[in-house]
Amino acid sequence: QKDCSLPVDTGRGKGWFLRYYYNKNSKTCESFIYGGVGGNKNNFLNIENCCKICKAKNC
């Protein structure tokens, strides 16, 4: 769960991928656009995985 406390990181690259991250301040999973390269582990393919792993309150 320590990955859930990492800040959102859109990464590099020219990709346009809809992803989700856990916002530790609001304790919710939120969407962001991922560039496709780099970033960190607070990056989920769907909101369900974000909710399951980070136990967000908006799930």
Curated annotation (Swiss-Prot):
Disulfide bonds, paired cysteine numbers: 4-54, 29-50, 51-59
This protein's record includes keyword Magnesium: no
Any single GO BP term: envenomation resulting in negative regulation of voltage-gated potassium channel activity in another organism
One GO cellular component term: host cell membrane
Chief place where the protein resides: secreted
Further details from the record: Negative results: has no effect on chymotrypsin and elastase.
Family: Belongs to the venom Kunitz-type family. Scorpion delta-Ktx subfamily. Delta-Ktx 2 sub-subfamily.
Name the UniProt record assigns to this protein: Kunitz-type serine protease inhibitor BmKTT-1
